[in-house]
UniProtKB/Swiss-Prot annotation:
InterPro entries: DUF3267. Its main location: membrane. The chain crosses the membrane at residues 18-38, 54-74, 102-122, 128-148. The lineage of its organism: Bacteria, Bacillati, Bacillota, Bacilli, Bacillales. GO terms for cellular component: plasma membrane. This is Uncharacterized membrane protein YhaJ. It comes from Bacillus subtilis (strain 168). It comes from the Bacteria. Keywords: Cell membrane, Membrane, Transmembrane, Transmembrane helix. It is a multi-pass membrane protein.
Length: 172
């Protein structure tokens, strides 16, 4: 196996650019989802109760995001544990390109529609669900950037996760 490309988002884009783009993407998604909600349910009065529940739901959504990332990879059973001194760090070895793409995009495609449906189901608290959806979309931005880089890789490529990024491997 040869390394076709190494992807490290911090080196490629920089932390400030990623954060700034993520914040802009959060705002864009919040505005678009809230406008879509207002078009579907005009004149709904919004309630500012349950702010603590909003915070708790946000934490749960970010945890569910991580779990959804891992599910496609676990289905392929490609997990290898490496020990680094006292800490154990899980790394993924030889993940097929399509599995990795599904793993990167699936949290956004699964969680965002659920949040929008929750906004429609609970219209008085729709702004909370739209905010969580926007925050989650910003949290997904690095996944989208990785997916864009992976799309350009050869079809038969494999992905190795390293401590500082991803390696795209191709067979000789």
């Amino acid at each position: 196996m040869n390394c076709w490309k190494t992807i490290n988002l911090m080196k490629d884009y920089g932390a400030v650019r990623i954060i700034l783009t993520a914040v802009c993407f959060m705002i864009l998604v919040f505005i678009s989802t809230f406008l879509a909600f207002e078009l579907l349910r005009p004149g709904t009065s919004l309630s500012d109760e349950y702010v603590s529940l909003f915070g708790g739901l946000l934490v749960v959504i970010l945890f569910v995001h991580k779990v959804i990332h891992v599910l496609p990879i676990i289905c392929k059973k490609r997990k290898i544990e490496k020990k680094f001194y006292i800490l154990r760090m899980r790394t993924w070895k030889r993940i097929p390109k399509t599995t990795m793409l599904i793993s990167l995009v699936s949290p956004f495609l699964l969680i965002t529609p659920v949040l929008f449906y929750a906004a429609l189901a609970f219209p008085n608290h729709a702004h909370y669900f739209c905010m969580i959806s926007g925050i989650h979309a910003g949290y997904c931005l690095p996944d989208f950037l990785l997916a864009l880089k992976l799309i350009k890789a050869p079809k038969t490529a494999f992905i190795d996760q390293e401590a500082d990024g991803l390696d795209i491997l191709v067979e000789k």
